[in-house]
From Swiss-Prot:
Active site: 51
Reactions this protein catalyses: uridine(55) in tRNA = pseudouridine(55) in tRNA
Enzyme Commission designation: 5.4.99.25
An individual GO BP term: tRNA pseudouridine synthesis
Keyword terms of this UniProt record: Isomerase, tRNA processing
NCBIfam families found in the cross-reference section: TruB
Top-level taxon in the UniProt lineage: Bacteria
Any one Gene Ontology molecular-function term assigned to this protein's record: tRNA pseudouridine(55) synthase activity
Protein species of origin: Coxiella burnetii (strain Dugway 5J108-111)
Protein name stated in the entry: tRNA pseudouridine synthase B
PANTHER family: PSEUDOURIDYLATE SYNTHASE TRUB1, TRNA-PSEUDOURIDINE SYNTHASE
Cysteines engaged in disulfide bonds, as pairs: none
Amino acid sequence: MTATNHPKLFKRPVDGVLLLDKPGGMTSNEALQRVKRLFHAKKAGHTGSLDPLATGLLPICLGEATKFSQFLLGADKSYSVKGRLGVRTASGDSESPILTERPIPKLTKRALEKTLSAFRGVIDQTPSMYSALKHKGQPLYKLARQGIEVERKTRQVTIYELTLLDWDNESIELYVHCSKGTYIRTLLDDVGEALGCGAHVVALRRLRVAHYHEDQMIKLAHLEREYDKANYTGLDRYLLPLETMVSHFPAIKLSSSTAFYLQQGQAVMVPNAPTHGFVRLRDQNDQFIGIGEILSDARIAPRRLIQKR
């Protein structure tokens, strides 16, 4: 019997980051709950939803890792996306009703590149009604399913890279490197409108979140097979250390007294510290203890500290 169908499971404190390769046809929360049960984890969270249709990198934070999830929520992300041309849908993907069908113009690489060039850099996006954004506490997608449409504010996002991977008479494949808050379904819908024929997503795969990339992903089916062999005891080796979530911040090594005062919630002075931003905090034994922020008076204030097990 696997953890996913066991009626009662004990829960344990376990800390780390799992880079899950989310299967298609599953919500991000369903994937999260499956992983949480497999690891018998007391606490778990993810760092940004993927559509049910989508596959790929879904970082799952267990235990103390949840304290640092904000640093991945705000990170750049990369995707590969395949769209069908000539058909526009309500949600921008293949899982909602068709809105329009239009003939597809003869497309050349030059014409496609010219169209895509308008979507590189800082662009405006209007989020789809089929999104997790909320209106008066209600997710937009729930309103959309009731046939209700509300006004959405346009937001600015940055498309760092938009590469044409392939195309034919009916479809287009793109690589997208983008800022947080970018809706790939909306991007493809807008590209389809710019081409004059409409388009919608038929396949979407997240390849990268911050410095985490697809080569590090673990499939859910593999975790379940490992669980069946040896329960949760063999799974912890797939967890990455907490510090990997914030490895892009400079590290500061603290004396024992400085670490003590920081862990009591006090801001401290540290020689040769950076002048601004976040820093990784390491104690006198060079163990990661959390994240601090440089204040205007050059002191370091604790922001996220881990609980010692």
